[in-house]
């Protein structure tokens, strides 16, 4: 039985837990789970959300728990596309909770309230995503943040917690990782004020780094094979062939030097292996074409 904190939350920590597996083994286990979801047209996102809410120690009758459940239901109704889908949200939410658990094992535990805010943002960060010929920075993230904010307001979430959720969703903008990694640099032109404020708040910056890593973990931190599956999904969604140039751009311009959070850094060896992976001699060129 875990100790219960105030506000109906229970601590989630690594005390007495089994040792962490090797990062490669953990990555393969997570990829196997996600592969099973893909084969079975899963998961049941509301059911997964209920389990994750209980895992992090949030009482089911709290506003944050309500927000997580309602966000999952909204994403399930939307369903999404080949890559930006309900399953992607399930993976990112699971990744976020795994990264938080890994960090807790290394003495960087998050309080249940922050885990709940993180979970809510993960569950809705790409809702209503749609392709565009010319993407405007933060436009899609602002749309998702507004959707989550409306859900949170209806559930009675406090203003400061809603502000945090909005900022975390904005921080998943693909090119934002460099801004999170160097918060001392001036905010780039066009950055929303709430995100600029996040970079000055260590607590929120920590959550944003974790969510950004969770958003990329399935594509860059589990296994080369699962990275390829992610590329196939994206190729179908964009109806574009993705080759070595796109691969280099993803790792250089989006992922950057490495993961940002303590939990993400645990998977650094996996990232290095995936970044260096190339097709073996005699295998087809690593070009992913839309189905």
Q: What does each model-found stretch correspond to?
A:
Residues 57-59, 130-133:
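Surface-exposed cleft-lining segments at the edges of enzyme active sites
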Residues 2-53, 83-90, 95-114, 124, ...:
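Divalent metal-dependent phosphate-bond-processing catalytic cores, especially two-metal-ion Mg2+/Mn2+ enzymes
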Residues 106-117, 155-173:
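Acidic/histidine metal-binding catalytic segments
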Residues 67-72, 118-124, 165-173, 210-214:
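Short alpha-helical scaffolding segments that buttress acidic/His motifs in well-ordered protein cores
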């Amino acid at each position: 039985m875990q100790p219960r904190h105030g506000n109906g939350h229970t601590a989630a920590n690594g005390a007495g837990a089994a040792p962490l597996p090797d990062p490669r083994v953990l990555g393969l286990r997570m990829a196997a789970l996600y592969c099973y979801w893909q084969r079975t047209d899963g998961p049941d996102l509301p059911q997964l959300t209920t389990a994750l809410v209980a895992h992090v120690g949030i009482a089911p009758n709290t506003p944050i728990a309500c927000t997580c459940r309602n966000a999952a239901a909204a994403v399930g109704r939307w369903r999404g596309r080949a890559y930006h889908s309900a399953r992607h949200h399930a993976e990112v939410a699971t990744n976020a909770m795994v990264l938080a658990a890994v960090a807790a094992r290394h003495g960087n535990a998050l309080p249940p309230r922050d885990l709940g805010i993180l979970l809510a943002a993960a569950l809705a960060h790409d809702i209503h995503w749609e392709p565009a010929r010319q993407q405007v920075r933060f436009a899609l993230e602002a749309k998702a943040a507004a959707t989550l904010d409306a859900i949170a307001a209806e559930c009675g979430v406090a203003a400061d917690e809603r502000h945090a959720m909005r900022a975390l969703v904005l921080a998943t903008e693909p090119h934002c990782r460099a801004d999170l990694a160097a918060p001392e640099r001036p905010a780039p032109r066009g950055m929303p004020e709430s995100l600029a404020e996040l970079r000055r708040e260590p607590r929120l910056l920590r959550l944003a780094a974790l969510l950004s890593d969770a958003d990329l973990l399935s594509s860059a931190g589990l296994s080369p094979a699962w990275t390829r599956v992610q590329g196939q999904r994206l190729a179908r969604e964009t109806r574009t062939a993705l080759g070595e140039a796109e691969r280099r751009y993803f790792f250089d311009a989006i992922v950057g030097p490495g993961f940002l959070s303590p939990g993400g850094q645990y998977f650094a060896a996996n990232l290095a292996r995936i970044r260096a992976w190339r097709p073996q001699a005699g295998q087809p060129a690593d070009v992913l074409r839309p189905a």
